[in-house]
Amino acid sequence: MTPNETLDLHGFRHKEALELVQDTLQSLDRQGSFSLTIITGNSTVLQQRIFEEILQQTPYHYYVPGWNLGQIVVSHTQW
């Protein structure tokens, strides 16, 4: 497993943020196993869009940690 990567979406419009998340996940997937923390801040709308438009169509595991509701942790283990 690679070290945890971080993607901070502060300052991005939703469309740009979604494209950046998609591109980052594709890049990390090509490398194999990964862990990615996506920082969304207080935007529950953006979080929901990331869940519905990107993550639900992937085999990745993801969750919003209880200690920081402004982020999404995504992980993938390739055997």
Placement of each model-derived feature along the sequence:
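Long, charged, low-complexity intrinsically disordered regions
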Residues: M1-W79
